[in-house]
Amino acid sequence: MSRNRKDKPFRAVTELPAELTQARRFGKTRSAQSGALFEDYVELIADLLATTGEARPTDIARRLGVSHATAIKTISRLKREGLATGRPYRGVFLTATGQALAERMRTRHRLVVDLLVALRVPTEVAEADAEGIEHYVSEATLKAFAHFLQSSGLGVRPEKR
């Protein structure tokens, strides 16, 4: 009896990678998860500053879908890490280090969105998916994405954030 590809059962893993290799892979993912929170905050703060001139904790909390207390706690951590500063009654601002991180994240985000759109993922879906993917891909993978877009003639779209 002939089976098409959909009917094939899940193929079980028959060989595991070396322990150290697997541990490094999982470690990289855990590290990216912890960094993703700061990256999202820094990216949003930069966007708010660029569009409205201020980044208030209330606005940050609403846009990230977290409580005001959670936003305040995370902003305090950003300040301790040297990524942000605050001024009484003026909101949150990024340090040079925070601004550089925001720019790196914006570049990563645009590249992931461009690749997904080139693969015919609807733009709205690509934007949402890029919010997760951008934190987990390596620089080598991002370079491969850029190379693919350039060599395929699809190019990179101008920033539309």
Predicted segment positions?
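C-terminal regulatory/oligomerization modules of transcriptional regulators
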Residues: 1-18, 131-161
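Short glycine/proline-centered loop/turn elements that form peptide/ligand docking sites
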Residues: 34-38, 54, 70, 77, ...
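Basic, amphipathic "hinge/linker" alpha-helix immediately C-terminal to the N-terminal HTH DNA-binding motif
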Residues: 90-109
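N-terminal positioning helix adjacent to the helix-turn-helix/winged-helix DNA-binding module
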Residues: 37-40, 56, 97, 108, ...
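Residues within the alpha-helical elements of helix-turn-helix
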Residues: 63, 101, 118
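Canonical helix-turn-helix DNA-binding module
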Residues: 55-92, 96
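N-terminal helix-turn-helix DNA-binding core of bacterial DNA-binding proteins
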Residues: 24-66
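Arg/Lys-rich, alpha-helical DNA-contact motif
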Residues: 18, 105-140
